Each structure stands twice: as C-alpha cells, then as structure tokens.
Amino acid sequence: MTLRVRAPATTANIGPGFDCAAAALDLWNEVEVVEGDGDADESHLGVRAFALLAPTAGKSFRFTDRIPRERGLGSSAAVIALGLVAGALAADKDPAPEKLLAEGVQLEGHADNLAAALAGGVCLTWENRIVRVADNLPAVPIALVPEATVSTAAARNSLPDSVPHADAAFTAGRAALLGAALAQGSADLFGEAIHDRLHEPYRAAKAPLLEAARSNLPEGALGATLSGSGPTVIVWVREESAAASEAELASRFTEASVVRFAVSPEGASPV
C-alpha cells in the first residue's frame, strides 16, 4: 500500500474572525505513506494524527514541507490534516472533514486552520463543526512573510484575560459583517469587515509588518490583517489590481517574501 495526500496552507482569523474563520491557500504540504518495514517517528505531528485513525506499525512516512513554519500560515494544521486523511484512507474510514476535525482538534487545540485545511475554501467553525461558506474570498490575499517566526503559544500568551466591552462589541459587529461579506462575495463589505480589536492589537508587537503594511497600503487596497497568530501579514486587494499591488508591495517590503495567493477550493485529499 502506498498513499499520497496533500494539504493546503491556511490563513485564519481574517480580521475579526478570531479562532473561527479561515481560508485554504494554494500552497501544499504532502505526505507519502508506504506499507513495509518502516519505523515511523511517533513524535511527528502528522504521524500522531495518522495514529488517531490507523496503526502506524510497519509504515514509513515521508513528509514534504513547503509551508513555512511558525509564520501564521497553518503549517501545523496542514501536517495534522495530512495525517488524518491518510489515516482515514488507510483504515477505510469516512474522511469527511467534520469527522476528521473532531479527531484533530485534540492535537491542534483550535479548529479554524484545521477546518479550512480539511474542507478547503472559506470556512467558519464553532464547537468543532464546520460551515463552508464559499469557494473563494471577495478579495485577493497578498502575504508579507518575514524571516522571523512566532510560535502560536507565544502569540496566545500575548493576549489578555479580558478586553474592554466596547472592543468586544466592535469586533462582534465586524465579525457579523464578515459573515455577510463572505456570503455575498462583496469586496466592499469585506473591506469594512476586516477590523479587529480582540487579538490584533495585542499581537502587533510580535508582528511589526502589520502596522507597516497598514501605513503603506497600495492604492485601492482593502486593508491588512494578521495571518493566524502572525507574524505574516495579509494585504487584501481587489482582483483587478492584484498584479500591480503585488509589485508595489514587493518594492516596498524587501525584508519580506511577498506572495500572492489564490484560495484553494480543495482541502486535504489524496493525489
């Protein structure tokens, strides 16, 4: 038996959608699982995910990592998704995203990135459940990916135990608007929605590109958000100006890798 599975990068939160909104991106990690005399590394996150659904004994695992680690692009969620889908296929179990999500959150801890990595497209999550709201986003994501890394744990430790009621109310309103923007595919509403006071103000110190991007947006850009817990920043632009915006950002932010992504309608799947 040989299994090959791929899983996409993801961008989570999308402004006010803290821990509940994410989209799959067209950058892929892969795994090849071969039946034989393999000696699996049981400490590997993907192997641990596989083991939730199928035995690892006698199998070898070869992971190909293209998603940069600890940059806010869902690298750990992609690895978990690889293991879950491969494990489900190996055990002849249902690989439905919501069923796999229930298994995977015990490794990931939160569902947003993992939901999008499993289901593809644009997803909202709650209580380990998924609603896939669209194949695409109303705006094009251009990532500013720095060399610096930030662990999810460190980013979460920067969050306060409580926030002012006004900030919570503001973010709840924008999160509701984000849902409407996604459902309608409206770039104008999307640009109004991607503002947050719940997590980004507290994480900004570890992601200096966020304020820099907001102060140097290309003409017509809709805004900028942290990707996941950062430090990668997503600049959101309209489709018609995406190429020009990418070139402008690349000239301004030479200290970062500037990558224009497409949303992947496909999640983790065999290849």
Regions from the language model: what does each represent?
Residues 1-71, 89-98, 263-271:
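ATP-binding N-lobe of GHMP and related small-molecule kinases
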Residues 6-8, 117-119, 126, 143-147, ...:
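Short beta-strand segments
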Residues 35, 146, 235-239:
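Short beta-strand-to-loop capping motifs
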Residues 73-97, 118-120:
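DPxDG-like acidic metal-binding loop motif
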Residues 95-139, 208-211, 217, 224-225:
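Alpha/beta catalytic cores of group-transfer enzymes, especially the acyltransferase/condensing modules
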Residues 138-220:
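Acyltransferase
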Residues 182-271:
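Glycine-rich, charge-dense phosphate/pyrophosphate-binding loop(s)
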